[in-house]
Amino acid sequence: MLVRDFQRHVAQTSAAPLGLEIADARGSWLVDVRGRRYLDLLAGMGVANLGHGHPAIRRACAEQLRRYLHVMVYGELVLAPQVRLATRLTAVAGPPFETAYFTSSGAEAIEGALKTARKHTGRAGLVAFELGFHGDTLGALSIGGNRRYRAPFEPLLPQVTILPWNDVRALARVDRRVAAVVIEPVQAEGGVRVADTAFLRALRRRCSAVGALLVFDEVVTGLGRTGTLFAFQQSGVRPDLLVLAKALGGGLPLGAFLGSRRILATLARQPPLAHVTTFGGHPLSCAAAVAALDVTLARDLPTRAAAVGAILRRGLETLRARHRIVRDVRGVGLLIAIELGTPRATRRFAAACLERGVILNWTLHRDTVVRLAPPLTITRREVAHALGVIDAALHVAGRPA
């Protein structure tokens, strides 16, 4: 009955959702109403870095529930969870990040970053990259790198340029008409493609030379997934604005963009209230986020992601040698891709994993690439279990039709 009501009354985003009716979630596992357990290798699409239902997050939420929930639109009242989170985030991110603007989601944070860049620079041009994904709101979609998803909604924002990935020569098109260049240090929906350090450094130099703001979209990579707390720390390239979401809220809806006081102050004047949000930085979400950040740092989960990710990649490379259907294994930390030969094989592989109790899926812009982004707390035993299921599913996907 509930599945039928889900299909009838909850707006659908595809013709074939997973459709599992979930009764419980703990750690790396989801449990359906029949009691069957599923190993979640997507961490709720990169949200559950600490696993599902972490006790510290539950305690923080319970404590905040006893105090207050929403009390006023963003930016008017002093709310302790917001202040604590902004102080902690800017401290661990380091210069130039002095202040944080909180939102309800990653797409909303991207929208705020785009508005900030346009207002701060007085320019309209925006630059992004092929196969990039920054959200589905109108502005975020405008800088998306896959025309298949832009086309049904055009015309979108004007003066947007989409450049090829990792092409230093193409950066000459970033000129003094550009307000911002937006890039994911690792493209998630684009197939887990890692930006070259030399490319990011050249991009930083170009933005500085022409006065454009460099915006890093770390909605997926932020908070430890790549083996450092933020992916920009691996290249040493510091953006002007840093966009976070997904894992930031510890399972609750929360996004943010960080920058210097000078840049973000542009939203407070000429006119004042140039960018506002009702639910952005919700006290409950911020309380959960502080707890999540505390656990991430106390347990050094970025280092753990690097170590466990290396184990998972080695296991996948071993499977690659046994299964001709696997074309590539790549990634960083616990953001890993398995590239298969055809979209059909990819679908068969994902379905075979689900039948065996493992949840994963292909990326939005590369339908031959399966993404693995499990909780950073996944155990070595769970990794071994996942590799066994993946091995069996690759046998199924590799059989003749």
Model-based region annotation:
Residues 1-401:
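Conserved N-terminal phosphate-binding loop of PLP-dependent enzymes in the Aspartate aminotransferase
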